[in-house]
Amino acid sequence: MSAWVLPDHIADVLPSEARHIEELRRGLLDTARSYGYELVMPPLLEHLESLLTGTGEALDLQTFKLVDQLSGRSLGLRADTTQQVARIDAHLLNRQGVARLCYCGPVLHTRPDRPHATREPLQFGAEIYGHPGIEADIEAVLLSLECLRSAHVQEVSVDLADVRIVRSLLAGLPVGMHQLAQVHGALAAKDASELASLTRDFPSASREGLLALLQLYGDAAVLNEAENLLKPFPGAREALSDLRAIAARMDGVRVTFDLADLRGYAYYSGARFAIYAQGASDALVRGGRYDEVGAVFGRNRPAAGFSLDVKQLVGVVSAPSLRAAIRAPWGDGGALSAAIATLRRQGETVVCVLPGHGSEVDEFHCDRELVLVDGNWVVKAI
């Protein structure tokens, strides 16, 4: 195999795309900061138990594992940053009130999580800890929408669901893990006959409620129908009320609901959302409430947030035009170097042409040049 061939679903990022990614990264972090979120930078490598305790099988399978040559302990390359930020909130910051944290860094996956995806996403996310109320959920959704607006993403739509609905329908039932997984699978596939078979011994209210979920997807009218069908279940009613409150704050955005959507069931503890956009084959943003995320670190704080892959975002957002540069001759100092330094401090890109390379073309289009006129270095159009 050639030495330059990279592993499957791993790629170099070349200059034009790298510039676009970096501009998006800066814009996302600036947007999060404008909401009061503080930047943290967890390590790419951690002890395996810190990365995986309480996260479920899916993240375990996505995590690259190795042995620490210093300690002999098992290490993991993070496949998701949320667990690390929860550790930071629980043990390093240890604040009593609200903590707003954001991050942006690479994660590694053993397998791509969607067709044609990279196994090295650049994950951006924002999380708010310490507030159990619906306000934190709303802020997470609004911030994620503002992040997409800052990136000039067009025609977004938000899909809402809440794991508490299914949990309330199953509460108190003697359902084993295997049967629970089968019920979840039938709900995800919207397979009414399979779900009816699996729930034939359930109490009628729970059985009818679960079967009704298969039809409860669409616009806000779904919530009205669900409230009528799920009256015997207080947890479901609370979840529906929260979904209505979240949707009410999203002016000018198309909002849909799928009350049988169980993605992240083992992870989320309340409302969850996914944001789609024109040109994207999958959700650009996923987030929600995950109050149990810090429990494994001994500090079970309320938490809500979201994450996205900046590399995926690049695929649906046009790169802004690169500002034309100024071409300048190579010099050893004096007035020429001073003129170049002044232009760069003013925000201009000045490309010095090295000896023997005057006719070469690079990524930076130069529409001006620095020339010597009457003993002074001045900028002229090419």
From Swiss-Prot:
SUPFAM superfamilies from the UniProt entry: Class II aaRS and biotin synthetases (SSF55681)
Pathway where it operates: Amino-acid biosynthesis; L-histidine biosynthesis; L-histidine from 5-phospho-alpha-D-ribose 1-diphosphate: step 1/9
Top-rank taxon, per record: Bacteria
In alphabetical order, the GO MF annotations are:
histidine-tRNA ligase activity
Keyword list (alphabetical) reads: Amino-acid biosynthesis, Cytoplasm, Histidine biosynthesis
Any one Pfam family here would be tRNA-synt_His
Among InterPro entries, the record links this protein to: aa-tRNA-synth_II/BPL/LPL, HisRS-like_core, HisRS/HisZ, HisZ
GO BP terms: namely: histidyl-tRNA aminoacylation; L-histidine biosynthetic process
What's this chain's function? Answer: Required for the first step of histidine biosynthesis. May allow the feedback regulation of ATP phosphoribosyltransferase activity by histidine.
Q: What else is known?
A: This function is generally fulfilled by the C-terminal part of HisG, which is missing in some bacteria such as this one.
Q: What is this protein called?
A: ATP phosphoribosyltransferase regulatory subunit
Lineage, uppermost ranks: Bacteria, Pseudomonadati, Pseudomonadota, Betaproteobacteria, Burkholderiales
